[in-house]
Curated annotation (Swiss-Prot):
Residues 392-406 have a biased composition (Polar residues). Residues 123-134 have a biased composition (Acidic residues). InterPro entries: CNKSR (IPR051566), PH-like_dom_sf (IPR011993), PH_domain (IPR001849). PROSITE patterns: PH_DOMAIN. This is Interactor protein for cytohesin exchange factors 1. Keywords: Cell membrane, Cytoplasm, Membrane, Phosphoprotein. Its main location: cytoplasm. Residues 272-285 have a biased composition (Basic and acidic residues).
C-alpha cells in the first residue's frame, strides 16, 4: 500500500511543516507552473498535502540517498531542490529567505542522519496515476466443471513453483480421503484451509496482486486436484461426497469474494472523481483568463475592444467603494450629461439661424416651443449685465425679441 495514504492528523508531531510552492512536472503555457502545498517533514519522510485537513498526501519522498541544495537554475526566488541522480528531482520554493534556510537545515539534517533505504521500501510516490489500480472483474463460478479454461491453462504453464506446491498440497489432501469415517475430518480441514486462503485475498491485494489473479490460483489448484484424484481413487462414494463438499464451500467463498470486491469499486470511483476534478480545474483556468480579458475590455489578441451600451449603463450604475473616487466619478458623469444637453441646445439655435426663410412668425413659434432655452440664455446674461432685473429676465421686452430676431 502506498505510504501517501495517511492523513495529516495521523502524522502527529512533525519535525518541520509549513506552506511551500512545488513545481509541477508538466506546466502548461497559460497555467501557473508552481502550486502551493502544505509540506510536512517527519523523520526521513517528506509529505505534501493540498490542505492541513487532507486525508491523503498528494506526494511522498523518502529522503534517504537524496541530496538537498538551492535551485539556482529556477527563476523563482527562494527555490531549492531535493535531487536523486538516478531517480528525479523535486523543486520547492519558500515565501522568503528565512523560511528557505530553515527548510534547508531541517532537510539536510534528515538526509545526513538516515540510512539508505532497502530495495523493497518505497522511494517516492507523487500522483494518482502512479498507484497500481486494482483490477475488478466478476470471477467465473469455480468448480463448475473439472476442465480448466485456456487462459487458466496458460497461466498454469507460466506459474511459479510456489503456486504449483499449493496445488500439489491440495491434491495430496484430497488423496487422503479413502474411507467414509475419515471424510468428515478431512472435509473440515479442507474448509478451514479454503476459508483461510479466501480471507487472505486482501493481503495479496495489498502486495500488489489483483484479486482475479488470486482467484485463478484457487480455481487451478482445485481443478488440478480433481484431475489427479480421478485415476487414483476408485471409490465412487468418496468422490461424490467430495464434490458435494466443494459445491457447498463454493457459495460461502463466492459471498466472501463479493464482500472483498466491493472495496476496490469505491477506490476506482474516487480516482475517477479526482481525474474529473483535475480536468475541471484546467477548464476553470481558461474560463478565468477569458473573464479577466472581458473585464479589461480586451480581445483574445490583446486589442482594445469597444464598450457596448449595456456595459456603459452597468458602469454608470456601479459604485466604487472609495467615497472620494465615487464623488469624482459622479461629477464626471454629470458634466457629460450637461455637455450633451448644451450640444442639443446649440443644435436647436443653429437650426434656427441657418434657416434662409426665417420670418417673424417662425421665430415666435420657435420661441414658444423653446421657452426654457430662452430663459436659460437670459439667466446666463444676467451676471454680465447688472442693470437687468429678474422681472425683465423672466419677461423680456419686445425690443429684445426684435434684436434677437434680427
Amino acid at each position: 500500500m502506498s505510504r501517501r495514504r495517511i492523513s495529516c492528523k495521523d502524522l502527529g508531531h512533525a519535525d518541520c511543516q509549513g506552506w511551500l510552492y512545488k513545481k509541477k512536472e508538466k506546466g502548461t503555457f497559460l497555467s501557473n507552473k508552481w502550486k502551493k502545498f502544505w509540506v510536512v517533514l517527519k523523520g526521513s519522510s517528506l509529505y505534501w498535502y493540498s490542505n492541513q485537513m487532507a486525508e491523503k498526501a498528494d506526494g511522498f519522498v523518502n529522503l534517504s540517498d537524496f541530496t538537498v541544495e538551492r535551485a539556482s537554475e529556477c527563476k523563482k526566488k527562494n527555490a531549492f531542490k531535493i535531487n536523486h541522480p538516478q531517480i528525479k528531482a523535486f523543486y520547492f520554493a519558500a515565501e522568503n529567505l528565512q523560511e528557505m534556510n530553515v527548510w534547508l537545515n531541517k532537510l539536510g539534517f534528515a538526509v545526513t542522519h538516515q540510512e539508505s533505504i532497502t530495495k523493497d521500501e518505497e522511494c517516492y510516490s507523487e500522483s494518482e496515476q502512479e498507484d497500481p489500480e486494482v483490477a475488478v472483474e466478476a470471477p467465473p463460478p469455480p468448480y463448475a466443471s473439472t476442465t480448466s479454461s485456456p487462459v487458466a491453462a496458460q497461466w498454469a504453464s507460466s506459474s511459479s513453483p510456489k503456486r504449483r506446491e499449493t496445488s500439489c498440497s491440495f491434491s495430496s489432501l484430497e488423496n487422503t480421503v479413502k474411507a467414509p469415517s475419515q471424510f468428515s475430518s478431512s472435509g473440515s480441514k479442507e474448509r478451514q484451509s479454503w476459508h483461510n486462503i479466501v480471507n487472505s485475498s486482501p493481503a495479496t491485494e495489498d502486495a500488489g496482486l489483483p484479486l482475479t489473479f488470486a482467484e485463478q490460483v484457487h480455481t487451478l489448484a482445485f481443478s488440478e486436484a480433481s484431475n489427479c484424484q480421478a485415476p487414483e481413487n476408485n471409490c465412487i462414494t468418496s468422490e461424490g461426497g467430495l464434490l458435494n463438499l466443494l459445491s457447498s464451500d463454493d457459495t460461502s467463498s463466492l459471498n466472501n469474494n463479493k464482500d472483498h470486491l466491493t472495496v476496490p469499486d469505491r477506490a476506482a470511483g474516487s480516482r475517477m472523481a479526482d481525474r474529473e476534478e483535475i480536468k475541471s480545474s484546467e477548464d476553470d483556468e481558461m474560463e478565468k483568463l477569458y473573464k479577466s480579458l472581458e473585464q479589461a475590455s480586451l480581445s483574445p489578441l490583446g486589442d482594445r475592444r469597444p464598450s457596448t451600451k449595456k456595459e456603459l449603463r452597468k458602469s454608470f450604475v456601479k459604485r466604487c467603494k472609495n467615497p472620494s473616487i465615487n464623488e469624482k466619478l459622479h461629477k464626471i458623469r454629470t458634466l457629460n450629461s450637461t455637455l450633451k444637453c448644451k450640444e442639443h441646445d446649440l443644435a436647436m439655435i443653429n437650426q434656427l439661424l441657418d434657416d434662409p426663410k426665417l420670418t417673424a412668425r417662425k421665430y415666435r413659434e420657435w420661441k414658444v416651443m423653446n421657452t426654457l432655452l430662452i430663459q436659460d440664455i437670459y439667466q446666463q446674461q444676467a451676471p454680465q449685465d447688472p442693470e437687468v432685473t429678474p422681472q425683465e429676465v423672466m419677461n423680456p421686452t419686445s425690443s429684445d425679441c426684435v434684436e434677437n430676431s434680427l
